[in-house]
């Protein structure tokens, strides 16, 4: 018998079409006014506001942020960095994660499987000189790092922060 993910079932049962439409609209533009949001999803402003507050309280909406233009800020080099660890112990992973969490150049850090690496990082820096300083001055100095392989982005074809919600619609 297949395993049923109860958290997914609970989420599907809890979120109705208004909630899903609110989430979709807020993913497109979190600065939308409550009045405009209510009009777009077909509710009056007061219930719309209550639903947004409930979605925040329930943890569906984690926070609202501004998306910055990295190129205008001089951050023109993006690298995906694959990190191999010398030992696969909880202590080694915890140490790496605590150190890498302090690196502002690292936008994402994922523990991965299926490749010759333990972690994949997304790193954004101004240029190759800054990347070299980050690599040699910080990354390779982290205790336990045994290998580093970098791939550089030539052209970002898709960049989105919007999560797909279709699987939750009935």
Question: Predicted segment positions?
Answer:
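A compositional/biophysical signature of low hydrophobicity enriched in polar/charged and small residues
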Residues: 1-170
């Amino acid at each position: 018998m297949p395993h049923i993910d109860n958290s997914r079932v609970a989420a599907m049962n809890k979120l109705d079409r208004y909630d899903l439409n609110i989430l979709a609209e807020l993913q497109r533009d979190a600065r939308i006014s409550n009045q405009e949001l209510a009009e777009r999803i077909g509710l009056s402003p007061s219930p719309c506001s209550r639903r947004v507050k409930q979605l925040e309280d329930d943890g569906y909406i984690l926070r609202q942020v501004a998306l910055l233009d990295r190129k205008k800020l001089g951050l023109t080099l993006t690298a995906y960095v694959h990190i191999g660890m010398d030992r696969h112990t909880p202590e080694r992973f915890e140490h790496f994660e605590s150190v890498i969490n302090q690196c502002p150049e690292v936008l994402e850090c994922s523990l991965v499987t299926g490749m010759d690496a333990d972690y994949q990082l997304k790193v954004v820096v101004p240029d190759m000189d800054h990347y070299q300083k980050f690599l040699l001055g910080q990354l390779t100095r982290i205790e336990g790092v045994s290998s580093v392989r970098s791939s550089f982005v030539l052209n970002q074809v898709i960049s989105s922060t919007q999560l797909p919600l279709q699987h939750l619609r009935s």
